[in-house]
Amino acid sequence: MIRFEHVNKSFGNEQVLIDFNLEIPEGEFLTVIGRSGCGKTTMLRMINGLHTPDSGRVLVQEKNVAETDLITLRRSIGYVIQNKGLFPHMTVSENITYVPVISGKKDKLENRRLAVRLLKTVGLPEEMADRYPLELSGGQQQRVGIARALAADAKILLMDEPFGALDEITKRAMQNEMLSLQKQLHMTIVFITHDIQEAMKLGDRVLVMEKGRIAQLGTPREIQEHPADDFV
């Protein structure tokens, strides 16, 4: 589904990814953890073409991202970040259906039904559809962000510390929601976090990164019972 082949990336004199190789099979929930600046976000953004390798290749569904129409690619991949990225002047319903609308789906009734269905999928009631982002709590906004990512019928979901700003109770609820959604929709999820407990709870596998390289890749149990080195 997603493959990195000998990827190198630098910003100025700083090497961010170094001969990076990784394969993420379809339907896997991969959590990624590491210190700030280790290359996590750069790696994630290469999947949807927001960053390009200096050398090597990134493939999504066997297609080289560098040779793919990026608008089409990005509309097919859900992307959720910590600050939700919702448009404040749009209702929740309009936010959720933004990608389908700009992709040509103009039927208002159909889009409304899609928004309501996705609200229910992420655990929010129908009456939220006509509210604006500023009328929602942080946890509710994050759920709407996930619903919007799902609206394009994406099979891949990229998440960059999506729950980092939430309180612990809301964070745990969202984690459980994501586990349920992933099982229900069989999505491929790449999820960056600074929270080791979150990484262990959510990931089928956990990728530990350090200085642009893979320090260890394995199941939560493998990471806990057989750490590769003192850093891990």
State where each predicted segment sits.
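Conserved ABC ATPase signature
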Residues: Y132-L136, Q140
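Conserved ABC ATPase "signature" C-loop
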Residues: K211-G212
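Helix-to-loop junction immediately C-terminal to a conserved catalytic motif
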Residues: N48
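ABC ATPase NBD coupling module
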Residues: N64-G78, I102, K108-L109, H226-P227
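Conserved ABC ATPase "signature" region
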Residues: L109-E127, S180
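ABC ATPase "signature
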Residues: L217-G218, H226
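A short, proline-enriched helix->beta-strand linker immediately N-terminal to the Walker B motif
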Residues: A151-K155
